[in-house]
Amino acid sequence: MFLNKLIKNKYKQNFFSFKNYCTINNNKPLNGFKILDLSRVLAGPYATQIFGDLGAQVIKVENVGKGDDTRQYGPPFYVDEQGRKGSAYFSCANRNKKSIALDISTKEGQDIVYSLAKESDVFIENFKVGGLKKYSLDYETIKQINPSIIYCSITGFGQDGEYSKLPGYDFSVQAMGGLISITGDKENPYKCGVAIVDMMTGLYANIAIQAALHHREKSKDKKGQYIDVSLLDVQASFLANHGSSYLVTGETSERVGNSHPSISPYDSLKTKDGFMVVAIGNNTQFQSMCNVLGLPHLSTNPLFSTNPSRVLNRKQLLSILTNETLKFNTDDIVKLLGDSNVPCSPINSIDKVVNHKQIKHRNMIWNLPLNENNNNNLNNNNLNNNNSNNNLNNNNNNNKNIQNDKGEYIMNSINLIGNPIHFSETNIHTPSSIKSNIPPPFLGQHTDEILKNIGLNENQILNLKNNNIVQ
């Protein structure tokens, strides 16, 4: 078969074209690395999106038909001018990737993965333990094709142990890993507002892969390795002071709402028109807060003069402070306290965050045309700091709020929250660098391009499509 012939010929062609991948700026720190992404949902895709943001080439392998599960997560959904459909959920972790849709249960589909893996630096997946072995896409098989590859598996509970075969989801691991037990008020445990375990697992996976790449570059034989990352391990690792406190005392932490078990006042406080938070870290900050609120005597009161005493008398202290903060509008009291170097902030809704002047100043909202060919024509005003105070609804996407009869948002470009890393020498937040990003791909958007880059002609690609092997 023609794909087997490609493998025997040792894949003389590169699996992906540098020229086609990045339209403007290829001076990003991970430029040159090639990532083959068979993961889906959030943890794996978040890890590979970071690679893409930093300049690596990422190919996302998806199922024929439905693709990544998160393509169905919604509403909200959006469509571009060509009627191609995307989901807001999918878009949060899948920019800077190119999508190929193929059936890995077929020999032809597996051969395509082999040809891509041959030229890849990294292979990442989050199937159940052993899930890819039945498709001959497990580490032992892939490393025979490419001994230098870094192969990362993300699972709920790791590759071994009695829980290893169980499916793992962020919500269940937040519960099993103790996070929900310390989140919420005394009566009601709550999950985090975002899938924090998935996100942290993606970060750990990315760190682990970069460490393995560094080790490979230093080693004489340039040998790759296998990486096993699990959601439960990650959740346990960031129990932080709650975990260490138990290991010291043998006592578990109680839920204290927005309070801190060891610091006070470190809490949310009501204001005249909403809520604010204060995060007092030392006695000097507490004294400053008391002075602003007209309570200078409070900082010398033995009940509140030290942090341990404030923790013991937390309820009484918060009642006194709230009586004063209720006299102010949120913005006013936050400014007064901030001017006195008291750590505090309003509790912002999402719209206030993405339109915040500091977020805009830092170029943290990236506007990407859904048609990649329009990258060079992207209006710099969307990216220029001079316009950072403009509201997103009026600035980046005039069609943002228009919906069709299916409730889908009609969009020519998409706003995304950008990568938070700021480099001095390889700045990924300049207008030209932001313009070089590619939007979250539609399912199979780059199938033809990728297959042509591994040597297939149009007739061969059409044959694969007719047999539902690729899309």
Curated annotation (Swiss-Prot):
Query: Does the keyword Transferase belong to this entry?
Result: yes
Pfam entry (one): CoA_transf_3
Keyword Ion transport in annotation = no
Output one GO MF annotation. Answer: CoA-transferase activity
Which EC numbers does the record give? 2.-.-.-
Q: Which residues bind CoA?
A: 128
Region Disordered, residue ranges: 376-404
Keyword list (alphabetical) reads: Transferase
Instruction: Name the residue ranges with Low complexity bias.
Output: 376-401
Q: Which SUPFAM superfamilies match?
A: CoA-transferase family III (CaiB/BaiF) (SSF89796)
Catalytic residues?
A: 198 (nucleophile)
Coiled-coil spans are none
The record's annotation in InterPro entries points to: CoA-transferase_III_domain, CoA-Trfase_fam_III, CoA-Trfase_III_dom3_sf, CoA-Trfase_III_dom_1_sf
Q: Which family does it belong to?
A: Belongs to the CoA-transferase III family.
Q: Which protein, by its recorded name, is this? A: CaiB/baiF CoA-transferase family protein DDB_G0269880
Q: Which organism is it from?
A: Dictyostelium discoideum
